[in-house]
């Protein structure tokens, strides 16, 4: 019998891991706790005298200079994008994310450890349909030669291009169609990257304290410094897509639309999300039920790959 809706999801049990923060260098324990339908993803700083909850929503973004940082009442949670990408990529809607430090652990610099943690905990379907944010008209933002846009589509797709004047990176493009269930296989393992000259400057500023070749791709002027090289020939652009997925997930709902990104980063991704949210005519919130979706001209069965995720890790 065909399903009549795509329902919200949480974890089947509590799961946790430990790691260091990329910028703080602090040892942090991250714990994922199942949450009820409609709860959303909420970060909780448990290391404070009074725990502070910060919803994973665009309105709580307070910094995008080096990573995506959420904040509330003066309390911050940094580097949320890789975890958020894993949750979005594996269809998790409701979760309490506890941290005993200021930053989500960087792990290996990708989303794969978080995807594996989700897989180990198991996924539980809940008795409520997902709510989708359907893009209804084109929205774009520009910053110099950088640009990003969201346009109407039948499911979620990201087309990303980067262009660096560097012999190893240069120009790379990648197109991810969530209808093909490619996140775990094609994107989750792509690591963050940086230039050696920038890493040295950041460390002098007291940042990137937890950064190493174990959790980032580092390139000098001509080559990759990591002994094991790359996981994909185009790992750089794949990681940019991973970041974009994490940033766009701060809509608080799965997106139905096509994101096109050229030389974007966290700041421009967030600017795009905020611009969409500022104009209600740009989007529509729709329950992921067959009746409503087919009434909008969105093929219900065609969304299976984008919404009926399989918790698999390559």
UniProtKB/Swiss-Prot annotation:
* Gene3D superfamilies in UniProt: lpxc deacetylase, domain 1, lpxc deacetylase, domain 2
What class does this enzyme belong to in the EC scheme?
A: hydrolase
Q: Which Pfam families match?
A: LpxC
What are the annotated GO cellular component locations?
Answer: membrane
- Provide the disulphide bond pattern: none
Give its E.C. classification number. 3.5.1.108
Keyword match Transmembrane helix: no
| Positions bound to Zn(2+) | 82, 239, 243
On whether Amino-acid biosynthesis is a keyword of this UniProt record, the answer is no
Catalysis performed (reactions): a UDP-3-O-[(3R)-3-hydroxyacyl]-N-acetyl-alpha-D-glucosamine + H2O = a UDP-3-O-[(3R)-3-hydroxyacyl]-alpha-D-glucosamine + acetate
Cofactor(s) annotated in UniProt? Zn(2+)
User: What's the superkingdom here?
Assistant: Bacteria
GO MF annotations in UniProt: metal ion binding; UDP-3-O-acyl-N-acetylglucosamine deacetylase activity
| Active-site feature positions | 266
Q: Which UniProt keywords apply?
A: Hydrolase, Lipid A biosynthesis, Lipid biosynthesis, Lipid metabolism, Metal-binding, Zinc
Q: In which pathway does it act?
A: Glycolipid biosynthesis; lipid IV(A) biosynthesis; lipid IV(A) from (3R)-3-hydroxytetradecanoyl-[acyl-carrier-protein] and UDP-N-acetyl-alpha-D-glucosamine: step 2/6
Q: What does this protein do?
A: Catalyzes the hydrolysis of UDP-3-O-myristoyl-N-acetylglucosamine to form UDP-3-O-myristoylglucosamine and acetate, the committed step in lipid A biosynthesis.
Which family is this protein grouped under?
Belongs to the LpxC family.
- Official protein name in the record: UDP-3-O-acyl-N-acetylglucosamine deacetylase
The upper taxonomy is:
Bacteria, Pseudomonadati, Myxococcota, Myxococcia, Myxococcales
Q: Which gene encodes it?
A: lpxC
